[in-house]
From Swiss-Prot:
Membrane topology: Single-pass membrane protein
Alphabetized PANTHER family for the sequence: PHOTOSYSTEM I REACTION CENTER SUBUNIT IX (PTHR36082:SF2), PTHR36082
Recorded superkingdom: Eukaryota
Disulphides: none
Organism expressing this protein natively: Piper cenocladum (Ant piper)
Family of the protein in this entry: Belongs to the PsaJ family.
GO CC, alphabetical: chloroplast thylakoid membrane; photosystem I
Major localization listed first in the record, in broad terms: plastid
Protein name per the record: Photosystem I reaction center subunit IX
Keyword set, alphabetical order: Chloroplast, Membrane, Photosynthesis, Photosystem I, Plastid, Thylakoid, Transmembrane, Transmembrane helix
Coiled-coil residue spans: none
GO biological process assignments: photosynthesis
Keyword Nucleus carried by entry: no
Amino acid sequence: MRDIKTYLSVAPVLATLWFGSLAGLLIEINRLFPDALVFPFFSF
């Protein structure tokens, strides 16, 4: 039972950190390359 409580307290924190960092990354990409359908750093 203690393991379940530990999981339920850790999983939301990790999910919040992961989705927050992912959102920040997407925001920065859209700030550097606005309205880009094909990103310049993918085409070599």
